Amino acid sequence: MISRIDHVSIAVKDQEKAAHFFQDILGAVAGTCAADPVTRYFWQLFSLGDLSRLEIISPTGPGSFLDGFLKSREAGVHHITLQTPDIKKAMAHLEAHGVPFFGYNEYPEGVWTEIFIHPRDAFGVLIQIAQFESDDWLSEHVKFPAGTRWQVEKTQTGATLTFAHPGGGKVALEMDRKALQQLKESLENALA
């Protein structure tokens, strides 16, 4: 039902200050961002290390859905987002287990479909379950071109193997000549 944790969402009053902290101090790579005029908030994704992601959300004016959450705090963890390959199956699974959910929303062209589980039903945590393609939300320089799943680059001691990461983006593996030989033998055995 759940593929992985996609991101942790942090609500903040000061988007610029948060972006500076995560990018300039912690080294996060800024990704996709947008403003939602209906619920009056701005969101931006940031990738860290192995492409773990944070989403920073902030109100864009009075009447934002974040007003109540930020009323007595400057910032805090707002929700976690879990990725599913099939939102309809996830909904049926939750219903079969008596877990209430709300907020079904399908964005235009099917780029993102979501539901939420209220904190009272999820041990104090707001959970967003969403169906989407991970690479659609990443900065271009942390992912492969469409259709590319791996890349091999020769180094002085062996090679760097870079693979498409199941959560979007790519992950690199340094291998010396001995490890490359073992990999070659394993691949030959798999093809035999």
Describe the function of each predicted region.
Residues 1-2, 10-53, 89-112, 117, ...:
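Core segments of cupin and vicinal oxygen chelate
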Residues 49-51, 60-61, 85, 120-121:
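Short loop segments at secondary-structure junctions
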Residues 61-66, 156-160:
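Short amphipathic beta-strand starts and helix->beta connectors
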Residues 62-109:
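Charged surface patches that recognize polyanionic ligands
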